[in-house]
């Protein structure tokens, strides 16, 4: 077999493969002789049909099958010989397939980039240090208490903490829109479940009042027909209800799910949950900083085939999200909407894979099991969840990739300049830091290509 490779543009490669005619014809003859034993034809005993007759009838079909198989096997062999790592499936163009001549074809594809990740000691990470206090537990208890409130109608103007039950109907530019009306909708003032303009408009109203509330939809509102536009909502107040909050005692603890141990066990459970949320948020913040700076310090050329595949995946996710939210069938979303995010995700996937490869980072099976157990603990039947994951290889791979990414982050943090920053739980949980992105899709994709 002869193999030659030329660079087309950037990461593009064109590989020409020649397979000797003798090898091709030997494979064809072997297949025909094997087929001969099963051929049934009038005038011949079973298995005794002359080879030339079998060749005449089945030769073209068998030859096509053999050529297809040879292309697949020799393509993989040629990649190994030339030490090439394709980023996606090739385009195969046959050049010579005539009987008695060498098989020749060209495979066009992109390769994964060759690069190094250096300068990890220049990465700076600010790691939050948060202690869960009694005040943090008290705050959660108070929220639980308010969630268990019982509401009773009152004959007075509404105020913060009250529940106002309303009917509403909205228009934009005088036209109705999807989801523009609701009946018997409960709104707890101060809970943040409605836009500020709504809560302000519903403060100080009484049962039977009719009012109009104006609200401008944000530019990023999912429904593009009303995004960024001002809406007018005609509102009828059905009832105003004042809350009555329960005492925090053992009966309250049992009501919110703590069957034994009363308030003391409830406080312990709350603290445990807060510690878990803290740890997850700290890990997310650290991961985001690491990923940002890995992108900054690494110069990498991205295979177009991977970026295009990621764009398609992000587009499908957005279309699915729009459909699930009850919006009309979305129009074809342009690739430009997703390109920046797609390039970022692909780059991170390649960088993570390179760090795994170059530093021989092995998947920690104990961490995989720990991650599964923590996830399953949030369900009523954790054992069933664990069993389901164990039987679903695709789901398990997702957990494994996420754990491997966390191991890469840990490795980078060990090399980086880390500053521990004390802060309160409220500071930590404030929505100021974007959620750490994952290179999961790309990591899995690229691992299969190596």
From Swiss-Prot:
The reaction(s) this protein catalyses: [protein]-peptidylproline (omega=180) = [protein]-peptidylproline (omega=0)
Alphabetized UniProt keyword annotations: Cell cycle, Cell division, Chaperone, Cytoplasm, Isomerase, Rotamase
Domain annotation PPIase FKBP-type: ranges: 161-246
One GO cellular component, as annotated: cytoplasm
Subcellular location: Cytoplasm
Span of the signal peptide: none
Gene3D superfamilies on file: 3.10.50.40, Trigger factor ribosome-binding domain, Trigger factor, C-terminal domain
Top EC class of this enzyme: isomerase
Name this polypeptide is given: Trigger factor
């Amino acid at each position: 077999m002869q193999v030659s490779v030329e660079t087309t543009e950037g990461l593009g490669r064109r590989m020409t493969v020649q397979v000797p005619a003798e090898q091709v014809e030997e494979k064809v003859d072997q297949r025909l002789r094997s087929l001969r034993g099963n051929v049934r034809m009038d005038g011949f005993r079973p298995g005794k049909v002359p080879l030339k007759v079998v060749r005449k009838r089945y030769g073209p079909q068998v030859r096509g099958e053999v050529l297809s198989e040879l292309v697949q096997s020799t393509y993989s062999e040629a990649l190994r010989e030339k030490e090439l790592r394709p980023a996606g499936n090739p385009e195969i163009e046959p050049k010579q397939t005539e009987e008695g001549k060498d098989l020749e074809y060209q495979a066009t594809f992109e390769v994964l980039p060759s690069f190094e990740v250096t300068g990890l000691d220049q990465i700076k990470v600010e790691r939050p240090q948060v202690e869960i206090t009694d005040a943090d537990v008290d705050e959660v208890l108070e929220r639980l208490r308010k969630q268990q409130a019982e509401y009773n109608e009152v004959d007075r103007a509404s105020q913060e903490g009250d529940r106002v039950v309303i009917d509403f109907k909205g228009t934009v530019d005088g036209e109705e829109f999807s989801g523009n009306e609701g009946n018997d909708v409960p709104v707890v003032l101060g809970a943040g479940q409605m836009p500020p303009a709504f809560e302000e408009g519903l403060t100080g109203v009484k049962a039977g009042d009719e009012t109009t509330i104006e609200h401008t939809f944000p530019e990023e509102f999912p429904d593009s027909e009303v995004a960024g536009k001002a809406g007018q909502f005609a509102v009828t107040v059905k009832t105003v209800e004042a809350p009555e909050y329960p005492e925090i005692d053992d009966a309250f603890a049992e009501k919110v799910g703590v069957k034994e141990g009363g308030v003391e066990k409830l406080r312990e459970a709350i603290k445990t949950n807060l510690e878990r949320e803290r740890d997850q948020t700290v890990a997310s913040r650290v991961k985001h900083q690491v990923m940002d700076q890995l992108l900054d310090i690494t110069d990498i050329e991205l295979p177009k085939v991977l970026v295009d595949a990621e764009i398609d995946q992000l587009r499908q996710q957005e279309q699915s999200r729009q459909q699930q939210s009850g919006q009309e069938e979305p129009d074809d979303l342009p690739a430009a909407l997703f390109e920046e995010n797609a390039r970022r995700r692909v780059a991170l996937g390649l960088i993570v894979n390179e760090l795994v490869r170059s530093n021989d980072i092995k998947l920690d099976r104990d961490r995989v099991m720990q991650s599964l157990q923590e996830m399953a603990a949030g369900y009523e039947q954790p054992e069933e969840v664990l069993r389901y994951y164990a039987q679903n290889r695709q789901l398990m791979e997702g957990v494994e990739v996420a754990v491997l990414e966390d191991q890469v982050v840990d490795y980078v943090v060990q090399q980086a300049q880390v500053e521990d920053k004390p802060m309160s739980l409220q500071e930590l949980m404030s929505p100021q830091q974007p959620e750490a992105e994952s290179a999961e899709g790309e990591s899995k994709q690229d691992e299969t290509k190596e």
